[in-house]
């Protein structure tokens, strides 16, 4: 049956089922709840998802370029090519470029910075933003890098030279493999924006040591070190890059492990005592 319902100065007709009666304000509220706010939320989630994909693609192009840059393969500008300058100027510029990357990469990874940063950047895109900024700082380094062409060593034996190139490439393979072992897409932000898009809650981090992580604590960093140092031709510029990045890796490990101890406590302390930092099968000190 239909009954008149008084709403302000107007009389409305509302169909009632049994003894349940909906006021016009309740109807308005229900209509509103599936209206622009929900639609807008979905749009923003989709935009965040596209942003995460874009950041990942920039990273992917950057890491591929990094392989060519270090190994001197395919890419138009490598570690040994570019604008010729004085040695002092080249060293200063290159050190500043590496320092910029190191500061960005380390500061934005710290929990204190993340807590402050996520006041302005949505949590689901925090990791993608970090990945994007790191990629852009590396692209700047590749673009502005100054060569130092003085040869430190050059392997003349063709077989040994090929072996070193193969070892360097194996280092890059180790980097990629290690990221997939621990969840490549979470490490580079795609997992977070995908979960946000479908409305899935983020799961609390769990400490795990799959495959390579049973032998070394930081196989990704080990892969980078191998890739940077296994060079049949080592110029002064390549040596500067390899040496500074290796030093930064050890600094980064110290900062990262401090955060991991804060997060996992004794579980990570025991892992640190049991497993070597970088050298497989060597007991940790």
From Swiss-Prot:
The chain crosses the membrane at residues 55-75, 88-108, 132-152, 162-182, 224-244. It catalyses: methanethiol + S-adenosyl-L-methionine = dimethyl sulfide + S-adenosyl-L-homocysteine + H(+). It is a multi-pass membrane protein. Gene3D superfamilies: 1.20.120.1630. It is found in: Membrane. It comes from the Bacteria. GO terms for molecular function: methyltransferase activity. One of its GO terms (biological process) is methylation. Keywords: Membrane, Methyltransferase, S-adenosyl-L-methionine, Transferase, Transmembrane, Transmembrane helix. It is an enzyme of class 2 (transferase). Its EC number is 2.1.1.334. The keyword DNA damage does not apply. Catalyzes the methylation of methanethiol (MeSH) to yield dimethylsulphide (DMS). Belongs to the nurim family. This is Methanethiol S-methyltransferase 1. It comes from Bradyrhizobium diazoefficiens (strain JCM 10833 / BCRC 13528 / IAM 13628 / NBRC 14792 / USDA 110).
